[in-house]
């Protein structure tokens, strides 16, 4: 037998019977004549042979170069024309393509006509593989090997050109070749549903080898390098595992490119089950060499890794191929249109000019083709158009762009939504959706959203460009991008319980249309944006929060843009889009006609993600054939979290280390040099542990169910490295345990001088996000703690304050974050000495934010841009949106700017009183009551006209705010009770706040779950000192579920994870068991 594979029993029984027969695993398999002859034409007349065959005689032999015009060639090459007459270009000979020494080996093959049809929206050419049947797949593989092994682009293109010059000039032939060279651009075939992990298991099954064997371990752990082999490339792993098991080239039946294409067609059929896929893979495996298998799996994975970009390959095929592909996203159309266009023009040139004049005319023709007007290309429905893209620009460059405007209404600003860029194609009742990469997303969104499209899109035939996002009708806001496909695919997190009120309850898809490309059988891309928007409004009817048109705001100054960006930040929006109303729609173009403005593009704006020290907790093996493939080249970074803060001895270092765990936070793989990476690898290598989902480490906490897991993990308490990270933005996520992550992180420095205790804590990450999301949204429990979180003080604050970062940057920031340069201000008074003040907003008149900060420094005080535990007062002009979250947290006094002005004018520290207060903490209100009544009327000072006015104003305020002194009395009473009766049996739950799972929508009383069994637990909890909360907030310690109905466990877990709160889930049984035993029972014992 030629194979070293393990066959099924049926194969073994028939081995002797079939050993002399050709391998018929491929239908229409070619039969090889192993006898060598010098007369290659003897069998050409065989009636079964296809009369146009690929001829690869000495294709890469520099002494025998065959050159002829191809689709991309517009000049006639005359070099070595003397050899052309001796070579039959229509017959394939695969013996001496890559071996220049062995020139006498040829093979005769018999082929059968094979034609298959691929169903597409617009079928132009059937998959005719007759010519492909004459091209050995080994020739294609040898071509790829030569390209990948040569580092020079010019040599790569030279190999490709030599191969093409031997290739038959027909559009279908070029298409079948290009879809193998560029499988990632082939949209005719559906997804194979085969990735590295699946393929590895299938190969182990096909080879019938032990999963513990060397070859199996190489496949299953293909990313890992060993002492002898470099990992990171699955194709190479397949080759090494099969090279001693598969066919070799001696006397075998060669598989053709047509055979491979047929197998790929079969694998991509949408209803192909696993058994059928295994059968197809087995046929290919038994008929190919290890080298051919390597390239076969790379085609399946759509990762050729040959060093030639998509654009280089397309441009090599034809100068206008890139433009055509951007318009059609269809390789088949590109090959067809450009081939016939070139052939026609070349024929005209032959009739008009002599051979010596042809070269110059063809050069002119090439220039004309390069200047092809893309707007004259035919637009067809259901052929996705590459979307026009937006450029990134700084504030300074935006000024230049706006100054170049020829009219005051030339530019508009739109909101930038955090969704998926989607192109909607509508032809009557048929609607399709395409992603920005031209992938068909109809299967994902069609069933849910097509009825909305039919209702809202009035045009019969059109192409719309826009953003698909998720609207949450309960929270009344747009969701983050990560929730889009979860909603569309109905992954409600209920784990099959059938509960309709999962994490998707109250959510719906919403399409924000911002452009129209095609309407009424005509492209409108050549119209200016202003006209396209007018057409768009005529073609669409608005349906709130389901199908809308992006709102435009005309701008002509930087101040307007900054104001809009401030609002976007406050509203947690992703950013803005600046568009030129005179711009035409150019597919795949990224220029300043459209500009995206995000907070992270404005350096130093204090978005909370500028400069963080994070510890390495995991590693990832790199993939590919580059220098990082097969090594730990990417890292999972984490932050420490104190798992148990109830111990009183916070200075006990061993106890502190014992209680810390590490939450996963982000993944980084850039910013360091190869030398730095090798140094990290050397230092960390002895400490890595393989990560297993069946036995995850307790010290490293990942988001369940392991949405982002490393290949290896490390215990930072034993050894690790701290990396200084720069990122663009901090965002909410469910991929990491922290609940947040960084966008576009990169390493600034490896901090060998720091350990894990010096890096950012989980508490600080929460503060960073709240700073970014609502400017000054701090949560009291995380910033100051509630008296039980003192242990976190052991974590040193290694990160710079936002104020320091802003000062270091020296760049422009938004007004709400602007730090006034007071380096030249010399304090003239000591009124505010030792007092730290944060100014949020000044008046709109004389006393601006900047002037107030200067006054504070002149009076000896210190100013910051964000309040911290050391900040004494926050200053503002009124109850603006930016301080609402601070008011809700209740931990800091917010004072009117008038107090600063009065202190400055009177040159003394004016006592604070109710008239200055925008918000008073409980302690401040108590202090005020010692000197005056609740309306500010002093017990000591004489009443004046002004003080009486102030008292009346305070009465109005108190009527609105209901700030009564009874609250402080109640708090005092509760504290006293806890002090003297804390150990009594009736105080069992005194430290806990419970949320009872009574409502289908959390906190919504109108959605009460009928026939629940939680009423008794409600009474017991309150009787035994516990508190009940009807809101899901950070004060909750436990969520109580009905022991008889645990269907909502997953929903509650998702809710807790989304808020990143340390809340425990218990059942009514746990409540009763704790009461029966007069002590709090272990929770895990009950839930298990």
UniProtKB/Swiss-Prot annotation:
Chain intervals for the UniProt region annotation (Disordered): 1-56, 73-117
Classification via SUPFAM superfamilies: ATP-dependent DNA ligase DNA-binding domain, BRCT domain, DNA ligase/mRNA capping enzyme, catalytic domain, Nucleic acid-binding proteins
Entry's Gene Ontology molecular function annotations: ATP binding; DNA binding; DNA ligase (ATP) activity; metal ion binding
Annotated Mg(2+) 2 binding sites: 574
Annotated catalysed reactions: ATP + (deoxyribonucleotide)n-3'-hydroxyl + 5'-phospho-(deoxyribonucleotide)m = (deoxyribonucleotide)n+m + AMP + diphosphate
Principal place of residence: nucleus
Pfam families: BRCT, DNA_ligase_A_C, DNA_ligase_A_M, DNA_ligase_A_N, DNA_ligase_IV
PROSITE patterns in UniProt: BRCT, DNA_LIGASE_A3
Requisite cofactors: Mg(2+)
EC class (word): ligase
Sorted UniProt keywords: ATP-binding, DNA damage, DNA recombination, DNA repair, Ligase, Magnesium, Metal-binding, Nucleotide-binding, Nucleus, Repeat
Domain BRCT: 827-917, 984-1088
Protein family according to the UniProt entry: Belongs to the ATP-dependent DNA ligase family.
Protein's name in the database: DNA ligase 4
Organism: Dictyostelium discoideum
Upper lineage: Eukaryota, Amoebozoa, Evosea, Eumycetozoa, Dictyostelia
Gene that encodes it: lig4
């Amino acid at each position: 037998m030629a194979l070293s594979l393990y066959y099924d029993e049926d194969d073994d029984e028939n081995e002797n019977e079939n050993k002399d027969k050709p391998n018929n695993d491929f239908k229409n398999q070619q039969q090889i004549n192993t006898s060598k002859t010098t007369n290659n034409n003897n069998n050409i007349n065989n009636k079964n042979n296809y009369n146009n065959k690929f001829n690869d005689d000495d294709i890469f032999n520099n002494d025998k170069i065959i050159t002829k015009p191809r689709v991309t060639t517009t000049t006639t090459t005359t070099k070595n024309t003397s050899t052309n007459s001796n070579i039959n270009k229509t017959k394939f000979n695969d013996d001496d393509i890559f071996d220049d020494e062995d020139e006498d080996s040829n093979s005769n093959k018999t082929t059968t006509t094979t034609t298959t049809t691929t169903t597409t929206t617009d079928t132009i050419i059937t998959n005719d593989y007759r010519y492909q049947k004459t091209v050995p797949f080994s020739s294609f593989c040898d071509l790829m090997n030569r390209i990948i092994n040569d580092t020079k682009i010019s040599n790569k293109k030279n190999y490709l050109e030599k191969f093409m010059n031997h290739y038959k000039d027909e559009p279908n032939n070029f298409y079948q070749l290009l879809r193998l060279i560029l499988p990632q651009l082939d949209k005719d075939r559906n997804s194979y549903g085969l990735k590295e992990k699946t393929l590895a298991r299938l190969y182990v099954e096909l080879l019938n080898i032990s999963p513990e064997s060397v070859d199996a371990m190489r496949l299953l752990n293909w990313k890992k390098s060993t002492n002898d082999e470099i990992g990171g490339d699955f194709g190479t792993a397949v080759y090494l595992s099969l090279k001693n098991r598969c066919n070799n080239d001696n006397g075998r039946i060669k598989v053709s490119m047509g055979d491979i294409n047929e197998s790929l067609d079969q694998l991509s059929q949408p209803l192909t089950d696993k058994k059928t896929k295994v059968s197809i893979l087995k046929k290919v495996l038994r008929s190919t060499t290890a080298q051919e298998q390597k390239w076969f799996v790379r085609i399946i994975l759509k990762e050729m890794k040959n060093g030639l970009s998509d654009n280089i390959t397309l441009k090599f095929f034809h100068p206008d191929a890139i433009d055509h592909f951007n318009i059609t996203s269809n390789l088949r159309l590109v090959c067809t249109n450009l081939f016939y266009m070139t052939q026609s023009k070349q024929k005209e040139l032959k009739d008009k000019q002599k051979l010596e004049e042809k070269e110059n005319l063809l050069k002119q023709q090439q220039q004309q083709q390069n200047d092809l007007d893309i707007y004259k290309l035919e637009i067809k429905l259901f052929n996705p158009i590459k979307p026009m893209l937006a450029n990134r620009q700084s504030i300074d460059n935006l000024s230049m762009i706006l100054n170049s405007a020829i009219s005051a209404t030339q530019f508009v600003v739109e909101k930038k939504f955090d969704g998926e860029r989607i192109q909607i194609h509508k032809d009557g009742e048929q609607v399709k959706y395409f992603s920005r990469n031209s992938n068909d997303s109809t299967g994902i969104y069609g069933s849910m959203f097509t009825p909305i499209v039919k209702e809202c899109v009035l045009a019969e035939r059109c192409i719309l460009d826009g953003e698909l996002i998720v609207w949450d009708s309960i929270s009344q806001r747009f969701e983050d991008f990560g929730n889009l496909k979860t909603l569309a695919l109905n992954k409600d997190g209920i784990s099959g319980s059938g509960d309709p009120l999962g994490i998707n309850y109250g959510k719906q898809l919403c399409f924000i249309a911002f452009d129209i490309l095609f309407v009424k059988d005509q492209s409108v891309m050549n119209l200016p944006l202003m006209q396209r928007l007018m057409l768009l409004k005529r073609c669409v009817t608005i349906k709130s929060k389901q199908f809308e048109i992006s709102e435009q705001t005309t701008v002509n100054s930087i101040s307007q843009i900054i104001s809009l960006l401030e609002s976007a930040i406050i509203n947690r929006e992703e950013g803005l889009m600046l568009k030129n109303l005179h711009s035409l729609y150019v597919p795949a173009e990224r220029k300043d006609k459209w500009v995206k403005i995000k907070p992270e593009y404005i350096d130093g704006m204090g978005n909370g993600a500028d400069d963080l020290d994070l510890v390495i907790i995991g590693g990832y093996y790199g993939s590919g054939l580059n220098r990082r493939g097969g090594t730990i080249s990417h890292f999972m970074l984490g932050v420490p979290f104190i798992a148990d803060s109830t111990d009183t001895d916070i200075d006990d270092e061993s106890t502190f280390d014992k209680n810390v765990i590490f939450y996963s936070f982000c993944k980084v793989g850039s910013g360091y040099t190869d030398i730095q990476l090798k140094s990290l690898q050397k230092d960390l290598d002895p400490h890595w542990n393989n990560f297993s989902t069946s036995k995850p480490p307790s010290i490293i906490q990942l988001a369940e169910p392991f949405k982002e897991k490393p290949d290896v993990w490390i215990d930072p308490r034993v050894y690790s490295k701290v990396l200084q990270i720069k990122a663009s933005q901090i965002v909410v996520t469910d991929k990491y345990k922290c609940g947040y992550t960084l966008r576009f992180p990169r390493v600034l420095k490896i901090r060998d001088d720091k350990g894990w205790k010096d890096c950012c804590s989980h508490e600080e990450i929460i503060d960073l996000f709240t700073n970014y999301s609502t400017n000054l949204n701090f949560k009291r429990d995380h910033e100051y703690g509630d008296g039980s979180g003192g242990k976190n003080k052991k974590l040193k604050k290694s990160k710079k304050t936002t104020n320091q970062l802003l000062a270091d940057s020296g760049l422009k920031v938004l007004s709400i974050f602007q730090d006034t340069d007071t380096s030249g201000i010399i304090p003239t008074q000591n009124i505010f000495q030792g007092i730290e003040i944060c100014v949020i907003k000044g008046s709109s008149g004389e006393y601006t934010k900047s002037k107030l900060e200067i006054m504070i420094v002149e009076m000896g005080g210190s100013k910051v841009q964000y309040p911290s535990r050391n900040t004494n007062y926050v200053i503002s002009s009124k109850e603006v949106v930016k301080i609402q979250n601070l008011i809700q947290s209740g931990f800091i006094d917010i004072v009117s700017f008038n107090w600063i002005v009065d202190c400055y004018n009177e040159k003394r520290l004016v006592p604070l009183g109710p008239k200055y207060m925008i918000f008073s903490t409980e302690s401040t209100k108590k202090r005020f009551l010692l000197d005056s009544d609740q309306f500010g009327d002093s017990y000591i000072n004489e009443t004046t006209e002004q003080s009486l006015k102030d008292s009346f104003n305070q009465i109005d305020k108190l009527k609105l705010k209901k700030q009564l002194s009874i609250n402080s009395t109640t708090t005092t009473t509760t504290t006293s009770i806890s002090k003297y009766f804390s150990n009594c049996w009736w105080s069992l739950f005194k430290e806990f706040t419970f949320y009872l799972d009574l409502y289908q929508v959390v906190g919504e009383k109108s959605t009460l779950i009928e026939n629940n069994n939680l009423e008794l637990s409600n009474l017991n909890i309150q009787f035994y000192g516990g508190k009940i909360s009807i809101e899901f907030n950070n004060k909750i310690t436990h969520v109580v579920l009905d022991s008889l109905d645990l269907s909502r466990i997953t929903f509650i877990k998702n809710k807790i994870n989304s808020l990143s709160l340390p809340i425990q889930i218990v059942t009514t049984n746990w409540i009763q068991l704790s009461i029966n035993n007069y002590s709090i029972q272990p929770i895990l014992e009950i839930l298990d």
